[in-house]
Amino acid sequence: MTIIRTLFVYYSFLFILVLCSSKDTEVNNGEKVNIVAFGEGRCSDTSFWMKWHWLPMWRMLGSTGRINFEYHPYGIKTTCVDSDSGDDVVCECHHGARECLLNQLQACVIEALPNFEEYMEVVTCIQGKQNISMAAEACFNEPSKLERAKMMSCADSRHGRKLFSDHENFVAQMAPEMDWAPWILINGKRYKEAEEDLWQFLCDRFIDPRPIHCPKKIIY
């Protein structure tokens, strides 16, 4: 009886230890990781992150089915208000009017292709372009669900401005303290490390069991 009691205490201790360890390291045991990112169309930091962290991460880990992602083209020092007449929206952006148009174009694409798997390549292509004409020429050439003329018309319309302004609601709900772009939330919490090495950070901290696509655990 003493041996049974001793074994029970021992295995109970191991069970509690595993639970505490799992909580402390924030490992996501088989569940999906939810990532929400906010950025600005002509922000160099956003552009670098999307090109060198966001897109490569998705190409490596998207097939695992473990990542949920959403992007909102709305950053800091950005405001959208109803016009005096009340029939339009007036927006001002951190990097000027051209950025607003790029953000609006991205918002139009996200409306047309609501699934992240569909819109991410196009939104990344638009990101950082000098203007929407250059973005349209570079990003709407291949046969797709998107018509260049329709997207351009949307971007510079009341509807496009309204779509863009709607993304402000997500800032208010999920990132009211946002003071930097890109602003990246993982499972509802902001991690600056996700800006510096998204792929490595996700693999080291959030995805378990670790997919074969992940690099060796060396940092986090």
Swiss-Prot record:
The keyword Ribonucleoprotein does not apply. Its main location: secreted. Glycans are attached at N131. Keywords: Glycoprotein, Secreted, Signal. Disulfide bonds: none annotated. InterPro entries: Interferon-induced_GILT. It is found in: Secreted. Pfam families: GILT. GO terms for molecular function: oxidoreductase activity; oxidoreductase activity, acting on a sulfur group of donors, disulfide as acceptor. Residues 1-22 form the signal peptide. GO terms for cellular component: extracellular region. PANTHER family: GAMMA-INTERFERON INDUCIBLE LYSOSOMAL THIOL REDUCTASE GILT, GILT-LIKE PROTEIN ZK669.3. Belongs to the GILT family. This is GILT-like protein CBG03282. The lineage of its organism: Eukaryota, Metazoa, Ecdysozoa, Nematoda, Chromadorea.
